Amino acid sequence: MKLKTPAILSGVILSLVAGSALACGESLFRVGKGVAFRQYTAPLPGSILAVAKTEAELLMIEQLVAAGHDVHVVAEPSQIRDELGEHEFDIVLAYYRQRDVVAAQTRESRALYIPVAMRDTGEEREAADRYERSLASDDSVKTFLKTIHRALKARG
């Protein structure tokens, strides 16, 4: 009987201490609680053609691929038509200032053009007024993914 009392008392004290620790916010350290551990993922992976050649642009492309999109890259907007002839794309990403060349290249395609405007040049406002969806060149990967997801979802 003597042996059971200290064991029970120890169990009660341990449960009280553990309960207090969780109440103080330590629950954030439990896996899956409070902190996101997984990488961004594309719920609707799409086929994307992107005009990109700088290191920053190619880094964004890598992140879109890591999220699950199938991305093809061309260095110049004049190469879009050739790529569209070989593959079917859902979305074309290119700078807003290249919109006339992109429009000429995508005329016979079902691919949706999402312009990427340069920040602080006035392009952002113009692109937002002219297109249903647009991006800024320094938007986060999360913003790119959300915009692409909304475009793919709208297409059905």
Predicted regions and their residues:
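N-terminal signal peptide c-region/cleavage motif recognized by signal peptidases
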Residues: A18-S20
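Cleaved targeting-peptide boundary
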Residues: L22-V31
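Short, charged N-terminal beta->alpha structural module
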Residues: P43-P77
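Structural motif
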Residues: A50-E55, A75, L93-Q98, V116-D120, ...
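A short, well-structured beta->alpha microelement
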Residues: V65-H87, A94-A103
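Output/docking surface of receiver
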Residues: V116-L152
